């Protein structure tokens, strides 16, 4: 069954709602230029209130390695998501499992995956203006082609209306959704979250 990560969590209310709806993982954005940014101390307070067995992911963009590792320790992160131009060597120095994000323009965007030995590869739509959370889609055929590299996490423009189609086509390890389930940047719509998770997970039941 495809796993679901709800990213851009900024409040305890949204975190607990997403977990209750069946989210497997929650994402916290530690990139100050993002409208979904949350500071490490604020994130840690939310994370301490979560029930067990929920994976906690920290998203970073071209951050200093020391900041990444300190934040991982402060927050008790299970996984670090790197959304910038971090090198394979940098990934190897992170003291957590790493999910490396790649912004997909076309098939040529997939060549770099082979250079990275990480826990998962997140594929997102390319945007010159943003490192994710744009609500834009890319050609899912590229995600299908990338599956030979390892665990694929599908992102980019997913919402309750198209996630079942995406899961049926790609059969990714997980889907990662932020703007597709929001009321406004950083605040989640409970109905959209519940519907998206149900749609993403129903494929395995058919």
From Swiss-Prot:
Pathway(s) where this gene product acts: Amino-acid biosynthesis; L-tryptophan biosynthesis; L-tryptophan from chorismate: step 3/5
One Pfam match, given by its short name, reads PRAI
This protein's record includes keyword Calcium: no
Reactions this protein catalyses: N-(5-phospho-beta-D-ribosyl)anthranilate = 1-(2-carboxyphenylamino)-1-deoxy-D-ribulose 5-phosphate
Keywords, sorted A to Z: Amino-acid biosynthesis, Aromatic amino acid biosynthesis, Isomerase, Tryptophan biosynthesis
A single GO BP: L-tryptophan biosynthetic process
Q: Per its record, what are the GO molecular function terms?
A: phosphoribosylanthranilate isomerase activity
Q: Which EC class, in a word? A: isomerase
Q: What is its EC number?
A: 5.3.1.24
On the tree of life, the source organism's domain of life is Bacteria
Protein family (similarity comment): Belongs to the TrpF family.
Q: Do you know which NCBIfam families this protein is assigned to?
A: PRK01222.1-4
Q: Which PANTHER family match?
A: N-(5'-PHOSPHORIBOSYL)ANTHRANILATE ISOMERASE (PTHR42894:SF1)
Protein name (database record): N-(5'-phosphoribosyl)anthranilate isomerase
Q: Which organism is it from?
A: Citrifermentans bemidjiense (strain ATCC BAA-1014 / DSM 16622 / JCM 12645 / Bem) (Geobacter bemidjiensis)
